[in-house]
């Protein structure tokens, strides 16, 4: 995507403004670094830090064109994803108060009620970042961003943050996740799937159609991860495999 941008942001592309390329690459490269940091972080505090950085970079990239519509879409994405981050703040605070550490592996030592709070917060944050109901509204509007941004951030990378932190929490719990989280995850994934499919029909803009496609594909991953809470390891492995499948396929668009 970065290499493609070097051709996309040129005078040869008549439909694209030719100013602000330094700003574009700065936000894009910081975002890539933040994604690497989030994936490699072994603490929920580290995840929270990089979670917020990706949100800020997304705001800068969605609003790159500086039009009224793109700036409004950028602010919408920033607000919704930051409201979702409240769940991660809650989970981090609860984990630290209960165990004295931010290490994700400490989740396995929590009692059932505390674990429910931590997983509830993580799941809420994951819904916001991965554009699941009721926090899905920002993603279709985020397609105001330049096409390389839509391909990388909002189809292949940023939207995977939510499913990643949820999957990482499930792994850290050593298979002991409250079943209520599984039922809530399954229910919301199915509702998002149905709603997303219905929203395919009225779309006339291809990028918005792809955004709704991303939302429903992420619902499949949430559905698989939620089912895995009840025992089937194949569901977890299938969900993880589908993260890569969707990222490669959607980036082609």
What are these regions (language model features)?
Residues 2-47, 56-253:
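Hydrophobic transmembrane alpha-helices and their helix-loop junctions in integral membrane proteins
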């Amino acid at each position: 995507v970065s290499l493609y941008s070097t051709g996309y942001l040129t005078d040869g592309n008549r439909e694209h403004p030719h100013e602000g390329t330094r700003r574009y690459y700065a936000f894009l490269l910081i975002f890539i670094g933040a994604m690497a940091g989030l994936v490699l972080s072994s603490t929920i505090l580290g995840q929270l830090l990089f979670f917020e950085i990706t949100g800020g970079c997304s705001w800068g990239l969605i609003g790159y064109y500086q039009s009224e519509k793109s700036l409004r879409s950028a602010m919408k994405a920033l607000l919704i994803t930051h409201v979702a981050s409240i769940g991660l703040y809650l989970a981090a605070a609860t984990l630290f108060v209960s165990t004295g550490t931010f290490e994700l592996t400490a989740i396995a030592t929590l009692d059932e009620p505390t674990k429910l709070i931590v997983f509830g917060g993580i799941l809420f944050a994951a819904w916001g970042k991965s554009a699941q109901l009721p926090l899905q509204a920002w993603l279709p509007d985020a397609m105001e961003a330049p096409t390389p941004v839509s391909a990388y951030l909002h189809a292949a990378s940023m939207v995977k943050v939510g499913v990643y932190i949820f999957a990482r929490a499930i792994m850290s719990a050593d298979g002991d996740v409250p079943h209520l989280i599984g039922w809530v995850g399954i229910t919301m994934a199915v509702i998002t799937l149905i709603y997303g499919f219905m929203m395919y029909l009225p779309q006339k803009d291809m990028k918005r159609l792809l955004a709704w496609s991303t939302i429903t594909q992420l619902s499949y991953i949430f559905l698989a991860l939620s089912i895995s809470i009840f025992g089937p390891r194949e569901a977890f492995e299938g969900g993880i495999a589908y993260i890569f499948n969707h990222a490669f396929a959607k980036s082609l668009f």
